[in-house]
Amino acid sequence: MSSPDNQGPDDGHENDGPHNDGPHDDWDPGDLTGLEASAQAFTRTVDSLTAEDLAEPSLLPRWTRAHVIAHVALNGLALAAVIDGVVHDNPVAMYESDEQRDADIEELSGAEPSELRERHLAATTAFADAVALMDENHWAGRIDRLPDGPAWSMVTVVPTRRRELEIHHVDLGTSYTRSEWPEDFVVELLNAVTVDQASSGPFEVRATDVGRSWYVGGEGGPNVMGTGADLGWWLTGRGDGEGLSSDADELPSLGPWRRASATIGS
């Protein structure tokens, strides 16, 4: 069972105006400030869920809330193991195979709520500890999702992990919604998804609440307007564009997220 892809290259920073910039000079790829806040919010929600709540469907097809939490925990542990491998010059892939990944999620989703919570907390700690070992040379490396790829840049690891937490937090279908995403995360998300979005043609998205714009698939084409959170939700393949408007007759059609060299699968 697979969740929708919701990862892509993160550009770290954007100046005002419609473009997709790379990281600025003083951007620290190991800064965990935003990630820690996202992890704490996710943990509070996990702590609030009963066994009955965990068995309820999530917003993702065929997945319960327990499946989502299991995936987030195992993703964090996998990333921590990969980082540790890079630091100790013993590289490993995140997952042996997609089939094994899915089987592990299925198994953990059936665990007792206490074990599910413990694995999530262990993943949070392991990831932070692994990142703390990184130096400048390590950040220049790349990571494989599977033994035969795809590979992506190490500098995307922290923002990618944060996207896992924030997007899947909403996927749990609890009281936490995309409208609660922090503004810095919304900008980070739009930096990522506009770069990696395969679409039917070029268009521009304008986040009315943050006053910024991004091109998707090149310059030109219609404008799509809405809050940054609504735009990010739509561009990750979630929802039908509720809350968005366009100067065209309808919203542009979206293709699947590409698994390009700089993207990371869930």
Across the structure, where does each feature detected by a protein language model lie?
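Hydrophobic packing residues in well-ordered alpha-helices of helical domains and bundles
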Residues: 32-35, 113-120, 158-161
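Basic, Lys/Arg-rich alpha-helical nucleic-acid-recognition elements, primarily the DNA-binding modules
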Residues: 1-12, 16-17, 21-62, 67-70
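A structural signal for well-ordered alpha-helical segments within the folded catalytic domains
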Residues: 36, 40, 66, 73, ...
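Structured surface interface patches that mediate subunit assembly and partner/cofactor docking
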Residues: 2-8, 21-30, 84-88, 133-266
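Conserved alpha-helical segments that form or flank metal/cofactor-binding pockets of metalloenzymes
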Residues: 66-97
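Helix-loop segments that flank and shape redox-cofactor active sites
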Residues: 43-64, 90, 133-150
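A short, structured beta-strand-centered segment in the mid-to-C-terminal lobe
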Residues: 101-123
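Structural signal for well-ordered, non-membrane alpha-helices
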Residues: 43, 47, 76-80, 121-135, ...
